[in-house]
């Protein structure tokens, strides 16, 4: 799945991996031509049965960033939106969280392709136990899939070993936008400048809540 690792020293903070000569990094456009390669990678991860260290808990992540942010959170109607976001916790519990090994951070740039056509998935910093639908939500959000592209990918991914819940994907999209919008506020307090990235993700979370609230899947 990943490139070969030669050195991994936790104490020194050093990691040395194989260098893939002339590798191509995917982007939000090229990733949509690789469904037949990406789906098996995710199926392998999600059906592996491996127990990864740590568990990615979305609602705890929200609380974590809220506690780290020193100033007032600058997003419109944040308190009301937060209540709606946290109301999803019970719904997720009712649906059931399928605890599997996950990559967590499926931005297109974490997929690289060798000149021979082999696809690698890199940057496992956030990998932990979570519901596989989190990974699918991340894949769709980070590369801005259309509904038609989502269904096309799911036709490659869905199987008896890797079932799909479209409702959970919708919920995890909202949670991801909420988390990364808060992450942006925290980082900008530390001096970073992400432009309108944070507010755009927050606004998309709000739209997602409105759409989910009107969905007949609930």
Kindly give the residue locations of the regions a language model identified.
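Active-site activation/catalytic loop segments of kinase-like enzymes and analogous catalytic loops
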Residues: 133-161, 174-192, 204
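Start-of-helix signal in alpha-solenoid helical-repeat scaffolds, especially tetratricopeptide repeats
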Residues: 167, 171-175
């Amino acid at each position: 799945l990943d490139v070969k690792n030669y050195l991994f020293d936790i104490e020194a903070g050093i990691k040395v991996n194989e260098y893939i000569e002339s590798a191509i990094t995917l982007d939000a456009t090229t990733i949509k031509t690789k469904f037949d390669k990406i789906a098996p990678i995710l199926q392998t991860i999600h059906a592996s049965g491996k127990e990864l260290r740590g568990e990615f808990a979305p609602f705890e992540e929200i609380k974590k960033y809220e506690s780290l942010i020193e100033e007032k959170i600058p997003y419109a109607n944040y308190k009301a939106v937060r209540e709606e976001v946290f109301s999803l916790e019970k719904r997720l519990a009712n649906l059931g969280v399928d605890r599997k090994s996950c990559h967590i951070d499926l931005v297109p740039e974490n997929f690289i392709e060798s000149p021979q056509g082999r696809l690698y998935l890199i940057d496992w910093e956030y990998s932990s136990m979570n519901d596989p639908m989190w990974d699918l939500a991340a894949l769709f959000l980070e590369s801005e899939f259309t509904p038609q592209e989502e269904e096309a990918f799911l036709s490659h991914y869905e199987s008896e070993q890797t079932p799909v819940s479209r409702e959970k994907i919708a919920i995890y999209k909202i949670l991801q936008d909420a988390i990364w919008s808060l992450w942006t506020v925290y980082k900008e307090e530390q001096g970073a400048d992400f432009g309108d990235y944070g507010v755009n993700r927050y606004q998309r979370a709000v739209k997602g809540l409105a759409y989910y609230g009107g969905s007949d899947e609930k």
